[in-house]
Amino acid sequence: MSVQHWLDQWGIQLPANNAETCRLQVADDPELVLEKVPGGWLMAMRLGRLPSPMLLGVQLQLLQANGPFSALAPVHVAADSAGDLVLWVEVQEGHVDVPTLNNWYAKLCQGHKHFSPLLEAVPDQPRPASGARLFV
């Protein structure tokens, strides 16, 4: 099954010029970037700039998203060369069917909805110092 079969459900066509990267907008969802990789495509959604400072809880959630037991798996979080965080999943042509691609797309959207608000810059405010950090 190809990515084009998946896009057919929305009446979207991949560029005919054999572009390496294309940006798509499906309904009101965040922009989806498709980038050609050997043997398939990378589906990605930009989350935004890596904020500084970032709350420790947000850092831990981002790290957990890459774990094998994450609700978003097989979607991953990474930073691109511009310093933006992106959600991504690799699609191997001929190895994934349309329902699976729909599921992965839903996970990209779910991750975007969850993480985008958390990545807004945190005001630099003094925080009380403690001798230990406790996690509950």
Where in the sequence are the language-model features?
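Charge-rich, low-complexity N-terminal segments
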Residues: 1-31, 70-72, 78-80
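Short, well-structured hydrophobic secondary-structure segments
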Residues: 32-52
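Short, internal acidic amphipathic alpha-helical interface segments
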Residues: 46-86
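Ampiphathic alpha-helical segments that act as solvent-exposed interaction surfaces
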Residues: 61-63, 68-70, 91-124
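Short, highly charged C-terminal tails/helix-capping segments
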Residues: 119-136
